[in-house]
């Protein structure tokens, strides 16, 4: 599963398989290379569709970019995505399971895709679209650990449910933060507790970058997702307790005084 690579195929695969004589064509463009892109997705579903997956649907540009150029209108982008979603829906029914309610699928409403979902006062977005009826709608943070949006009471009726794409690491504009953990556990607790309380419970995804140095916040994020009753919104001020617990797990062979020092450093950094 990827937040932007649909139908169980990675963008890097297309990079190496594309070409003038390739069955997949030579352009990551659903308008000019519809047959090649459809074949690329179809082969991904044939190869991996019977395994346990959450299948990403939708389409973005190469390397985590917007799919259409700057001259494209909001309506242009929305109509393209509708066409893409209809094609992917048919492929998944043919090669994975005709009963789509038994196939976990998600679309990440990340960056420009969020705008295509909501639309504006003149252009109806994809919210409520038949093509997304049973699809998990993955909301996103702002790349810096702050939730951008949460489902309203009316939106929570969506059959596919909601997910959250959260960042502990980010490489991109306007500011990257990588390699050294700078994610404050109380903030993770606050934001993800809020997400859960607003019905975001189907799928949590976290961008951890290079795992080394991010083990601490990653462990908390995963433990919170696995046992929300223990570490979630009812567990007020639990992050200090979690820090001590995690330090004991990682540094159990050192003296208790040293463990306390390590925990203090983690809490105060």
What are these regions (language model features)?
Residues 11-17, 67-71, 117-123, 149-151, ...:
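Short acidic, glycine/serine/threonine-rich loops at helix termini
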Residues 21-26, 64-75, 169-181:
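Glycine- and acidic
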Residues 2-8, 102-109, 139-140, 165-167, ...:
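A generic structural motif
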Residues 25, 29-36, 73-80, 84, ...:
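Catalytic cores of large soluble enzymes that bind and process phosphate-bearing ligands
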Residues 30-159:
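Gly/Pro-rich turn-and-neighbor structural signature
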Residues 139-145, 152-269:
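Structured mid-domain segments that build the active-site/substrate or prosthetic-cofactor binding neighborhood
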Residues 2-42, 159-165:
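Active-site-adjacent "subsite" loops/lids of carbohydrate-active enzymes
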Residues 6-9, 62-64, 113-114, 143-145, ...:
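Solvent-exposed loop/turn segments at secondary-structure junctions
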């Amino acid at each position: 599963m990827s937040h932007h690579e649909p139908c169980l195929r990675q963008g890097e695969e297309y990079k190496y398989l594309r070409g003038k004589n390739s069955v997949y064509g030579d352009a990551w463009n659903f308008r000019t290379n519809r047959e090649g892109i459809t074949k690329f997705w179809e082969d991904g579903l044939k190869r991996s569709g019977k395994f346990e997956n959450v299948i990403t649907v939708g389409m973005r540009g190469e390397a985590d970019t917007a799919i259409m150029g700057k001259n494209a209108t909001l309506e242009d982008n929305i109509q393209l995505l509708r066409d893409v979603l209809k094609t992917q829906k048919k492929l998944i029914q043919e090669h994975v399971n005709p009963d789509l309610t038994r196939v976990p699928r998600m679309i990440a409403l990340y960056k420009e895709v969020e705008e295509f979902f909501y639309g504006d006062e003149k252009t109806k977005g994809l919210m409520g679209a038949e093509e997304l009826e049973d699809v998990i709608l993955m909301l996103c943070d702002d790349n810096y650990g702050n939730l951008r949006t949460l489902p309203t009471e009316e939106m929570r009726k969506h059959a596919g449910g909601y997910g959250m794409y959260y960042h502990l690491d980010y490489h991109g504009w306007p500011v990257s933060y990588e390699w050294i953990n700078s994610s404050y556990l109380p903030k993770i607790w606050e934001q993800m507790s809020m997400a859960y309380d607003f019905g975001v419970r189907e799928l949590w995804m976290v961008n951890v970058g290079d795992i080394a140095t991010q083990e601490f916040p990653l462990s908390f994020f995963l433990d919170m997702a696995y046992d929300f009753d223990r570490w979630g919104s009812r567990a007020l001020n639990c992050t200090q307790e979690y820090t001590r617990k995690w330090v004991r797990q990682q540094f159990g062979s050192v003296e208790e005084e040293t463990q306390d020092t390590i925990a203090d450093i983690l809490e105060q950094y």
